Amino acid sequence: MERPSVRSYSIRGSRITEAQRAAKDALQKVHGIEFTQQEINLSEIFPKSDKVIMEIGFGMGEATAIIAKNHPNNGYIAVDVHPPGIGKLLARIVENDLTNLKVIEEDVHVVLQHMIPDESLDGIHLFFPDPWPKKKHNKRRIVNEGFLALIHPKITKGGFIHIATDWVPYAESIQEVFAASTLFTGGVIEKPEWRPVTRFEGQGIDKDHAVNDMMYLKA
């Protein structure tokens, strides 16, 4: 699978500030991983980590940085395409002296296809992906049959994908996709205490949006 012809994200609204650009330019070579069409060795990147978790889409990076800080024994690879968020997360890495978090600027589909070895990820976090609420845009949602087929071989035996969304129709769609697959087992769970409530999530809660956490284990 190359980069999908129908993207699950939009670059609109990705205006980067001077501070974010400066952080991105200065820090990406140190705390980022450059995209390559060759597999990377996660054991070399995170030699002291008990587990390696991929964060797909991280907004402005607040939750990702908190999770990495609170779980120093895990290694985290954060993948996104939006320059402002990448610059902000790189700055957070420095501010919090995080040695267990790396950033990749690229479409996660091609990152998984080319860079991530099979059975090398202990888990995947997919928190608040774009729900694409308009029916004509539903095909742009990241969670679909092809996505499950892509991530399944990359996850270790007993590994997981944890998804959270505050858009109920999307939560229902996600559950339908997984229910139709034999690759994963699981369903809705209680929000774990370790997952921070981001500003974006808080805004949704203020609007009475119901947040659904879902956990699926590799079958």
Where do the model's predicted regions map?
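Short alpha-helix immediately C-terminal to the canonical SAM-binding loop
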Residues: I86-K88, A171
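Conserved SAM/SAH-binding beta-strand->alpha-helix loop
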Residues: H82
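Conserved beta-strand signature within the Rossmann-like core of class I S-adenosyl-L-methionine
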Residues: K157-T165
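Class I S-adenosyl-L-methionine
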Residues: A171-A219
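Class I SAM-dependent methyltransferase "Motif I" SAM/SAH-binding loop
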Residues: G57-G61
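S-adenosyl-L-methionine
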Residues: M1-M54, A65-K69, L90-D118
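A short glycine-rich, Lys/Arg-flanked "PGG" loop and its adjoining helix->strand segment in the class I
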Residues: V143-K157
